[in-house]
């Protein structure tokens, strides 16, 4: 092998090795920030297709309805505990130590993100409340043939008289 060909081969191998190292570091970083979404039934019984349950200490997102009558607030702090259930009957307890969103209510849909504990409770770091199901974006309303118009102040005033 002549020196020029040997130099090209060394450069190609180094380039491929560098790309492989960058790709593996990128995949490792993405894997550590991955939040898998589960329903309460999937946490209790495992995923329907694989039977895999989330492990304790794993960061996950849980979506479901807040069980009516399950919310317990600590009067001396922001700590709140509530249960989240789904239509399949699964239920998981969620603890949260911050201000709840304004739309949060019992019987309302939520998504909670946090770490699953050894006891099966989710220690939430973020709670997102879903919007009212009756809300319809203007684009959807327009597609359905409904008209949503805002009255300006002069029209509201004349309508009131």
From Swiss-Prot:
Localization of this protein: Cell inner membrane
Keyword terms of this UniProt record: Cell inner membrane, Cell membrane, Cytochrome c-type biogenesis, Heme, Iron, Membrane, Metal-binding, Signal-anchor, Transmembrane, Transmembrane helix
NADP in keyword set: no
Lipid bilayer topology: Single-pass type II membrane protein
Cytoplasmic side stretches: 1-8
Broad class of the protein's primary localization: membrane
Periplasmic compartment spans: 30-161
GO cellular component: plasma membrane
Matches recorded under SUPFAM superfamilies: Heme chaperone CcmE
Region (Disordered), start-end ranges: 138-161
Database matches in InterPro entries: CcmE, CcmE-like_sf, NA-bd_OB-fold
GO terms of molecular function: heme binding; metal ion binding
TM spans (from-to): 9-29
List of residues binding heme: 131, 135
Family: Belongs to the CcmE/CycJ family.
Record PANTHER family: CYTOCHROME C-TYPE BIOGENESIS PROTEIN CCME HOMOLOG, MITOCHONDRIAL
Protein name (Swiss-Prot/TrEMBL): Cytochrome c-type biogenesis protein CcmE
């Amino acid at each position: 092998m002549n020196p020029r060909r040997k130099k090209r081969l060394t450069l190609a191998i180094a380039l491929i090795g560098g790309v492989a190292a960058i790709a593996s570091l990128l995949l490792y970083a993405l894997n550590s920030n991955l939040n898998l979404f589960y329903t309460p039934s999937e946490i209790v019984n495992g995923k329907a297709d694989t039977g895999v349950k989330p492990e304790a200490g794993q960061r996950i997102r849980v979506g479901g309805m807040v069980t009516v009558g399950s919310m317990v607030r600590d009067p001396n702090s922001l700590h709140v505990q509530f249960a989240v259930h789904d239509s399949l009957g699964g239920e998981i307890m969620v603890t949260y130590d911050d201000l709840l969103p304004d739309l949060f209510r019992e019987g309302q849909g939520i998504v909670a993100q946090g770490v699953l504990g050894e006891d099966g409770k989710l220690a939430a770091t973020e709670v997102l409340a879903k919007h009212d199901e009756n809300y319809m974006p203007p684009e959807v309303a327009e597609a359905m043939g409904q008209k949503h118009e805002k009255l300006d102040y002069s029209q509201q005033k004349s309508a009131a008289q």
